[in-house]
Each structure stands twice: as structure tokens, then as C-alpha cells.
């Protein structure tokens, strides 16, 4: 859920923070690094030109026509900032670069309705790998700077339900594991962990179309830090008490 919220606020941030760059972007210019590389979101200003991931702007050339073919933008020091292929002003494939020359992100169309976006740390290590289906992030994995997986999620193609969602600490210990156990009935298992990696709680869940959310449903076990277990029964998201 936190990653879905992050994606939502990232989209909003792109639309607000970089609105001044877009609508109709002029001929290539040289950019100041501090103004285009956000410490959290990276070089996000070109996302407005990517219709495959929800962009709604067009890039024009110096004559006012929609850009066609390869375009490059640079930093003030002359290093490449952006290289992208445009069709009718829309990005089809592109790479952004840090001022040190390392790739900041790379986007490409894989097949009809399927595209891939990879983001990188300044040292070149993979930061995020996102596969979009029909404009929505279907498969998403984030990494820590040390290469460990921080978060990974897979959704159905129609984005109607989650297939799996897992988060990990920087040392690789699990924090939360949520995965489907019965695709037809939309039944799930969920496990939560303490910081030391010991199990904290586990039990079954189900997807409810009525509330469009996941509910505890069945016998849940909760563990204290010594490992002592207590059991609780849940039905349709409500705990049943005797």
C-alpha cells in the first residue's frame, strides 16, 4: 500500500513540480543539474511526455511542430541529460543520465500494451524495475543501494487484485509477505515480522469486491517477541470474540 501511495504522490509531484517545463517543450536546451535532478524522484520531468505511463504533454521543435525522431538535451557542462525517440511529440523510448554519465532511468516498449521502466542510483546500481501494462504498474520491484530487494509487488493485468506484495529490511530480513493462495477464490496468506526477522503475525485473508479491499478471514496467530502465540478468529474483516 505504501508503494501505491508513493506512486500516486510521485505522479502528482511530476505534474506540479515540473509543470513549468512542459505543455510544449522548445528546442533542446542546457539544464542546470540542481534544477532537474530531484533527490527523491530523480529526473522526472520527461514523464509528462510519456503517454505509456500517463503523460499528457507534447514536445515541440523550434518551429512549433511536434518533435519527430531522436532528441537530446544536455547539462550546462555539456554532458547528456536526455536522449529520446519522439513520435508526434510523444516519447517512445528514452534514457536520462546523471551528470556523471551514468543512466538515471531507461524506458522502452516491450510489446503491445507492455513497457518497462528502470531507475538507477547515481552509482549505476538498479533502484527500481517497473513493468507497465496498459498504463498501470503491473510488476514493481524497488532495491536498496546495497542491492537487496526493498519491496516487490505484482498485480493482475486489469489491476483488479494483487498477486503478491513483499517488503524487506536492508539486511534482507522479511518485513511483510502477502501472496495469493487461491486465484479463483481470491484467498491470500499474510505474514508480518519483527525487525529481527522473527514471525510477528500470520493468517489468511480474502479479497472483498464489496469493499474493494483485503480482509482478515480465518484463524490468525500472533506471536510476542519471545515466540509465545495467541490465536484470534476473524470473519469478513471483523474479529470474532466468544
Mark where each language-model region is:
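Bacterial Sec-dependent N-terminal signal peptides
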Residues: 1-26
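Glycine/tyrosine- and acidic-biased, solvent-exposed loop/turn segments at the edges of beta-strands
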Residues: 19-242
Amino acid at each position: 500500500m505504501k508503494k501505491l501511495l508513493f506512486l500516486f504522490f510521485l505522479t502528482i509531484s511530476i505534474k506540479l513540480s515540473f509543470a513549468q517545463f512542459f505543455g510544449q517543450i522548445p528546442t533542446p536546451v542546457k539544464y542546470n543539474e540542481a534544477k532537474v535532478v530531484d533527490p527523491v524522484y530523480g529526473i522526472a520531468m520527461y514523464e509528462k511526455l510519456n503517454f505509456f505511463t500517463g503523460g499528457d504533454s507534447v514536445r515541440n521543435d523550434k518551429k512549433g511542430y511536434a518533435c519527430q525522431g531522436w532528441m537530446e538535451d544536455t547539462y550546462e557542462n555539456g554532458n547528456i541529460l536526455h536522449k529520446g525517440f519522439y513520435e508526434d511529440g510523444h516519447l517512445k523510448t528514452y534514457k536520462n543520465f546523471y551528470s556523471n554519465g551514468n543512466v538515471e532511468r531507461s524506458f522502452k516498449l516491450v510489446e503491445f500494451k507492455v513497457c518497462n521502466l528502470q531507475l538507477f542510483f547515481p552509482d549505476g546500481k538498479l533502484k527500481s524495475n517497473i513493468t507497465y501494462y496498459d498504463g498501470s504498474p503491473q510488476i514493481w520491484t524497488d532495491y536498496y543501494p546495497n542491492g537487496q530487494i526493498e519491496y516487490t509487488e505484482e498485480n493482475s493485468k486489469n489491476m483488479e487484485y494483487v498477486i503478491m506484495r513483499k517488503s524487506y529490511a536492508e539486511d534482507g530480513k522479511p518485513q511483510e509477505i502477502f501472496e495469493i493462495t487461491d486465484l479463483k477464490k481470491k484467498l491470500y496468506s499474510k505474514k508480518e515480522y519483527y525487525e529481527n526477522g522473527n514471525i510477528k503475525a500470520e493468517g489468511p485473508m480474502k479479497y472483498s469486491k464489496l469493499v474493494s479491499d483485503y480482509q482478515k478471514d480465518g484463524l490468525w496467530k500472533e506471536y510476542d517477541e519471545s515466540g509465545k502465540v495467541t490465536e484470534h478468529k476473524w470473519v469478513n474483516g471483523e474479529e470474532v470474540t466468544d
